[in-house]
Amino acid sequence: MTNENNNDSEFAELKIRGKIFKLPILKASIGEDVIDISRVSAEADCFTYDPGFMSTASCQSTITYIDGDKGILRHRGYDIKDLAEKSDFLEVAYLLIYGELPSGEQYNNFTKQVAHHSLVNERLHYLFQTFCSSSHPMAIMLAAVGSLSAFYPDLLNFKEADYELTAIRMIAKIPTIAAMSYKYSIGQPFIYPDNSLDFTENFLHMMFATPCTKYTVNPIIKNALNKIFILHADHEQNASTSTVRIAGSSGANPFACISTGIASLWGPAHGGANEAVINMLKEIGSSEYIPKYIAKAKDKNDPFRLMGFGHRVYKNYDPRAAVLKETCKEVLKELGQLDNNPLLQIAIELEAIALKDEYFIERKLYPNVDFYSGIIYKAMGIPSQMFTVLFAIARTVGWMAQWKEMHEDPEQKISRPRQLYTGYVHREYKGIRER
């Protein structure tokens, strides 16, 4: 991938053991420029050290831009707030995958294709039956998505012509598998997709309908879930997206790649944070105890952590959190819980107190996307073990867009991070009787 804004006349100088190396500065279209260190190891006989890759750009991308200091998130140049308020999830999916918003005809064709591919092979039901009833839905979904490669053996050796159809299949089937995982975990029959419903309605239908009870989708709930899906669709090179790219760099089939993303997302520091927020609000219990827990959060010797505040990238108010705060109020008002939902009251007061506290101001700890999403899910009747599953439904769009972009990038190679070795230099082996 070539950045047209790169200027080969700009260099950074790096001095190593008395020798100066000139490193090209690659110009970003917006945001931070990047120093190209790709030749340092070959020319200077050393590597760079960056735990957590916080100062490392692993790729060039045109999909998502974040300015953490200003609280900006854009997909293909469009502000996330505009997309959340004016677009719908499948339109954003099209934007991420193809790079442009669709025309009316393109949108209709895309949504029809997604609906057409929402069914999964009937034999997948046997896989679900191998899990015990107490299995976490994420465990079931992780296995089910990985198993899709068995049903599409032609994609074990995929070609460029397969990229778009693969993305559509994945976007279509993930909600079906997610709903099946939930239904199995609670012992209810699976509900098949209904192609007369749109993407979000269909998922709610598969989640909450039963063979003997039709589920009527509340438009406020549908709109809220649509926003949540959009807000979680992509977020640049985070842990799960990087995992998908690393797996994809080896040439692994797309179903295997997405399953690695799901595994990474399952980690409590990544996709499980909104569930942790709910547990924290329950632990606080009442607004009167907020000062006590604020003090605990400041005490470095106290294990308590204020969940839903702070972000590895954002040093300002997370723009997704601002949308979700208002969405949360809309949902609770519709459900008659706006004035009597204890979790919301604690959350609002906790946010207000924290944003005025110098400790949090100095450390730039603002509410993030996880702070209000769990409250919305809980009000919708979605159990906490499904929170990360819904995150995976939304993020699959970003994963597939990033996977497609990676394979279209001629500069990409198989990922191979290096290390700073600090172990033993050399030891002689001794037999077990001599140790």
From Swiss-Prot:
Species for this entry: Rickettsia slovaca (strain 13-B)
Pathway: Carbohydrate metabolism; tricarboxylic acid cycle; isocitrate from oxaloacetate: step 1/2
Cross-referenced CDD domains: EcCS_like
PANTHER family registered for this protein in UniProt: CITRATE SYNTHASE
Active-site residues from the entry: 311, 370
Domain of life per record: Bacteria
Protein name stated in the entry: Citrate synthase
Keywords recorded for this protein, A-Z: Transferase, Tricarboxylic acid cycle
GO CC annotation: cytoplasm
